[in-house]
Amino acid sequence: MNHYFYNMVNPDEMETLEYIPTIPKFLDFIRKQYSDYPAISDKVTTYTYEELVSRVAKRVTFINSLGLEKGSNIAVLAKNDLDAMELFLAIPAAGHVLIMLPNALNDKALAGISMKFDLAGMFVGKEFTEVTANVPCKTWPSTSIGETESAFADVEKDTTAAIFFTGGTTGAPKGAVHSHGSIMRGSFNGVFGPGSILHKRYIAMLPLSHIFGAIMGYMAKLYTGSLTFTCTDMRAGIGDIPVVRPTTLVLVPGLVEIILNIAKAKGRAFLGDLELIMCGAAPVPPRQMAECREFGITLCAGYGLTECANLTSGNCDTDKKPESMV
């Protein structure tokens, strides 16, 4: 089965990539491999890979200054903005456990999570200062950053890196614990796709609190030296498609349906340079695959218990096997 995925990728590009077992080592890799390429952008500010990793290292400096015990649970409640993207990397790179929180949580839910997971603290975006005013843990602005860089923590692939909340598949939400090796294996699995995979353009449509969005929609894109645009509002993110002209989108079937309906109304020009949609986290209707083909877009379908396995399989032969997930 490994050959199915390896054989679909440009072999020259595949030679430049390798499985990296921890987030600190991954940061060193992308800094060296893609230094001057653009990494993340909110359409106003764009950071290269060199700048991104430098800023992550400065955030590690701030985290280290807090004097927390290594392996502490640290949450982030923020929009899908540049700060959240940096904190997603900085917290595990500092040797702590990242918990990305869904934006819809109310004050009671946040208080309960703080106590249940023994949070050492929470980085909070400006939009969430009111709802976090009484949480029983320390809070820091999501903009917090040090003035100088610090070395990344020395962690192993089995060191806990993050906790993601499950959806409805397994009943009541619970925390799925992921090691560095788990996060990075999923991120490496996410690089595979048909044809050229390096230096593409994406919009981070799915929240970083959703592991499919975090792994497939962000980490795997860093792995390939691609440019990822922030998406702090889903409606605005969809409207950005003809503006930033992503080549690839990582979506769930519900979002694919919305985008297809808009394209039917406005025409193919709305989709810009879009050529590939990676779709998962729920069953993908064969009808959507057929409609994407009509717009000249390949829709690759995947499905797995994403909170627990983060990236399990994908179907890049939807024309031949539309019902298959392999």
PLM-predicted stretches and their roles:
Residues 88, 99, 103-132, 147, ...:
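Conserved ATP-dependent adenylate/AMP-binding module captured primarily in the ANL superfamily
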Residues 19, 45, 60-105:
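Conserved AMP-binding/adenylate-forming
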Residues 247-251, 259-322:
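Gly/Ser/Thr-rich phosphate-binding loop
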Residues 48-50, 161-185:
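Conserved AMP-binding A3 loop
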Residues 147-165, 172, 195-201:
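Conserved pre-ATP/AMP-binding loop-to-beta segment of ANL
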Residues 12-21, 141-160:
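Flexible, low-complexity linker/hinge segments
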